[in-house]
Amino acid sequence: MAKLQIKLVRSVIGTTPNQKKNVEALGLRKREQVVVKEDNAQTRGMINKVSHLLEVTEIAE
């Protein structure tokens, strides 16, 4: 299964509480932090909710 590299490029200051929770659920706390997650429907849904704050790249295995 492919993986996604997710980077927080914008701050969560000024976003809604639900967006902040989504970013935290993805494992991101600080700007410029990078995490690697499995590419599945749940992760894609969370990314879609806060796509304006993130930079996402696919990692082929």
UniProtKB/Swiss-Prot annotation:
Disulfide bonds: none annotated. GO terms for biological process: translation. Pfam families: Ribosomal_L30. Keywords: Ribonucleoprotein, Ribosomal protein. InterPro entries: Ribo_uL30_ferredoxin-like_sf, Ribosomal_uL30_bac-type, Ribosomal_uL30_ferredoxin-like. Signal peptide: none annotated. GO terms for cellular component: cytosolic large ribosomal subunit. GO terms for molecular function: structural constituent of ribosome. NCBIfam families: rpmD_bact (TIGR01308). Belongs to the universal ribosomal protein uL30 family. This is Large ribosomal subunit protein uL30. It comes from Clostridioides difficile (strain 630). The gene is rpmD.
